[in-house]
A protein has these predicted regions:
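A structural signal for multi-pass alpha-helical bundles of membrane permease subunits
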Residues: 4-296
Length: 296
């Protein structure tokens, strides 16, 4: 009598789960595929309507019409040349500005939030609860309410229309303080006691703890980089010179002049804007997942 293969039920479940998730996967990736293929389309092709079902039950030209609507007639790099040749938007300059702002905010926010979280988790001091409530308030209060005070503050310090004036407000984050407070609370006390027995100063103890929480550092750095990369409000208030603006502001201007800029060039700019965050998430996904699982 043959024995049933114990792996068959599990394999069947995976197949059924994959089939059930396939429509959701297609719904998620369709906008990205549409954007990428839109790079190579002319404006006439771009605005062709997409029919999701045939007008007639036996319409033999339906599938060819779907292909003609979804795929470009010709794959050409002309749209990339149009984008990079635009005088209205210095694309590589604003791309570099966004990269500098996002990296600066991510590194600064990780450093400042980690130190604040360590202090909240391991020390008792006067006003601790009040400061922690303020950190929560930074999350709950809409950022729009801080826009004008931040602009006035930067103007007073001479930081308006500078990338540093955009980076500096972004390193202060209530979410990071709460996140790292929880991270350092989960560390065993034995590590801290061992470091303090050796007579190390508190800063040295803190630096000793950092390798133990480096997945959390990497995860939060990734989150903050992505948030800073897509930030629109603060750069809009702070930056006025075209060469100082960030990528979201340039994309906004690019779409505002859609009559003179091809839709393919707009899709190319949007695709370029997506690449850094997509690559960062793909590289850091496993560490991000393990950090969240340890925290929860």
């Amino acid at each position: 009598m043959s024995q049933a293969n114990p792996t068959q039920p599990g394999l069947l479940r995976r197949i059924v789960s994959s089939l059930l998730l396939l429509p959701f996967l297609l719904a998620v990736i369709y906008p990205f595929l549409w954007m990428v293929f839109g790079i190579f389309k002319t404006n006439h092709e771009f605005y062709q309507p997409l029919r999701l079902w045939p007008m007639k039950p036996l319409d033999t030209g339906y599938w060819s019409g779907i292909a003609d609507t979804f795929f470009p007639n010709e794959f050409s790099l002309q749209t990339f040349r149009d984008l990079l040749a635009l005088k209205l938007v210095p694309f590589w300059d604003v791309f570099g500005n966004s990269l500098m702002v996002s990296l600066g905010q991510a590194l600064g926010a990780v450093a400042l939030s980690a130190m604040a979280g360590y202090a909240f988790a391991r020390f008792q001091f006067r006003g601790k609860r009040v400061l922690f409530v303020l950190a929560i308030a930074l999350i709950l209060i809409p950022r729009q309410l801080f826009a004008w005070p931040l602009f006035s503050w930067a103007n007073t310090l001479g930081l308006s229309d500078s990338l540093f004036g955009v980076i500096l407000p972004g390193v202060v984050t209530g979410l990071g303080v709460i996140y790292f407070t929880q991270v350092f609370r989960q560390l065993p006390d034995e590590y801290l006691q061992a470091a303090r027995v050796c007579g190390a100063p508190e800063l040295r103890v803190f630096l000793t703890m950092l390798p133990l929480v480096w997945p959390a550092l990497l995860s939060y750095g990734m989150i903050h980089f992505i948030l800073a990369w897509h930030e629109h409000l603060v750069p809009m208030y702070m930056l006025t010179t075209e060469s100082q603006k960030t990528l979201p502001l340039a994309l906004t201007k690019l779409y505002d002049v859609s009559q003179s800029v091809s839709q393919g060039a707009q899709m190319a700019a949007s695709t370029f804007a997506l690449i850094p965050t997509a690559v960062l998430f793909a590289v850091c996904y496993r560490k991000f997942k393990s950090s969240l699982s340890e925290m929860l």
